[in-house]
Amino acid sequence: MALIDEIKDVVANQLNISDKSKITDTASFVDDLNADSLDLVELIMELEKRYEIKIPQEDQEKIKNVADAAKYIEEHKK
């Protein structure tokens, strides 16, 4: 499974989205998928756990959609 698709699955699970077609590469977690601040924290924590990375606070604020998350993970994955 491609990284983008894996991240979309994580987003769907964390945000309880049953219609995965809503989760596009550029759909904003907050504006388009209705995530709140707690959702974002939990999403980042799940990505950190799944991909064995640490995402500093200043970088977390830059991850606004699936494409941002995939780019960050590809650049920082061990």
UniProtKB/Swiss-Prot annotation:
Which PROSITE patterns does the UniProt entry name for this protein? CARRIER, PHOSPHOPANTETHEINE
State any GO CC term: cytosol
- Tell me the GO BP annotations in alphabetical order: killing of cells of another organism; lipid A biosynthetic process
Per UniProt, the keywords (alphabetical) are: Cytolysis, Fatty acid biosynthesis, Fatty acid metabolism, Hemolysis, Lipid biosynthesis, Lipid metabolism, Phosphopantetheine, Phosphoprotein, Secreted, Toxin, Virulence
Query: Cellular location of this protein?
Result: Secreted
- What post-translational events are described? 4'-phosphopantetheine is transferred from CoA to a specific serine of apo-ACP by AcpS. This modification is essential for activity because fatty acids are bound in thioester linkage to the sulfhydryl of the prosthetic group.
**Entry annotated with the keyword Thylakoid:** no
GO molecular function: any one? toxin activity
What family does the entry list?
Belongs to the acyl carrier protein (ACP) family.
NCBIfam families according to UniProt: acyl_carrier, PRK00982.1-2, PRK00982.1-4
Which named protein is this? Acyl carrier protein
User: What species does this protein belong to?
Assistant: Brachyspira hyodysenteriae (Treponema hyodysenteriae)
